[in-house]
């Protein structure tokens, strides 16, 4: 029960996963097993160097960006960067879900029958299992969590698959809990992707052959294995050391110099890792701590043991049968924030002894746990400012906007003129809110908040309300101070990152159940207006404010002083999208048709031939009639 509580899987599920993983090696692509109401998909492990580093990939670690339109959740919202993964592993997934196999149809069948799905694999088959799980989450689970049961991914000695953003995205979506990775103490495969391709490529094929259990056994004195192990662990040390220096904010001069002339591996652990020794299992959820353990668990103070570790790094890759069989009898420890590194036979301190963790290793793990603790503390600090944000936004909605509307020019134009005391108060609140949201964005960009923060519905909603209410004031201030004349268009040179971040968070949240991305949705709407070829329209709209409703006023300011014929396409685009923005709450229709508003004044100058046929015409008439009564 304790094991299942910590990992999300029980011993029986692990045993079946292992048996299926072994059986998958006799297949071309995958093995499907049904046990009770659960369907197991196990993937074959390939020991070909081409399946570790894609042949045409010239990057130092065989990496490639995941395509956002295929994996829209696998990205950083704060930094607007897509996940990096190993290209060879990704290609294996693409073959798997393509027409050459029955895998896609088999998964669809399991989903239709509401069966739980487990993806599993040993060695490099585990890499496929990890990406197949991500594909399932993006294709089925995110779109209908009630119809698609929660998956599980169980791997044995799998290599690392993706970068920090891969780890972060899984954490943001609360998907990390679905991944459980078993690692024997010295197994080299979970460390291989931390080495540079140029470091290991000459001996890689030979070592992969030794990792294949169907081939001839290795000897303790095999010098090629020793050289390979040494090179992998040298690079692993550099990655782990640089990572811990970043955690404690203390860059060592040697590491700074080293990383300046060659890149370090981007790959990072994801999910839960279960490290195994002869006596116990150690469960770890902290990715930073796992990275440190991947290096330090392969060290030893015993001279005799140290000399045979290269041999053990291959032998342990073949030791998962024994691990699985002993799950029920081994001691169990959990390394986390709430488990101090104490002594005693069943303590985490004793577990670290079994893993050969030195004093330096424990300091590095402590730094990783402290960094996690600090991220939690940072979130608590941000949470204390929620009431301040709500109070300031409420004043804008309940006091400032109604008073401005009573003057028939709206809060956008009133703020631009800034003739009233309330305009000054609004500016103070605007500046205060900017400080809070800039602080939040700074923490997000630096990874100093828990991964789940970006996915918090409460903060997404609050940031959206902030963007919709306050960005028009920033635009008003920008144009009121004539910054557009000195600096250029607001959308090109003036829009603060805090609004872009809030926009991305909102769009991601509402679109992820559809599997679509904001850019594609926008162009689908624009193409529906039938204004011309998309290529031509893209050139016209490249610096426009039509991609976001809270930028409505920025687009109006850019268009209002130009001849109608010159901006006809941009205006029709704005006009065509406005109905949806009003419906979604992005634009307040009470504001735009007030007699003194910038938009209404510009609207009145447009040709009657356009206004009569415009989609806004009936709405304008209705608003006028409502005010008249």
From Swiss-Prot:
Keywords: Cytoplasm, Hydrolase, Nucleus, Plant defense. Gene3D superfamilies: alpha/beta hydrolase. The lineage of its organism: Eukaryota, Viridiplantae, Streptophyta, Embryophyta, Tracheophyta. It comes from the Eukaryota. Its main location: nucleus. InterPro entries: AB_hydrolase_fold (IPR029058), EDS1-like (IPR044214), EDS1_EP (IPR041266), Fungal_lipase-type (IPR002921). The gene is EDS1B. It is found in: Nucleus; Cytoplasm. GO terms for molecular function: hydrolase activity. Ecotypes cv. Landsberg erecta and cv. Di-17 express a probably non-functional truncated protein comprising of only the first 162 amino acids. This protein is not expressed in cv. Wassilewskija. The active site is at 123 (nucleophile), 187 (charge relay system), 317 (charge relay system). It comes from Arabidopsis thaliana. Acts as a second functional copy of EDS1. Can mediate HRT-mediated resistance to turnip crinkle virus. This is Protein EDS1B. Disulfide bonds: none annotated. Pfam families: EDS1_EP, Lipase_3.
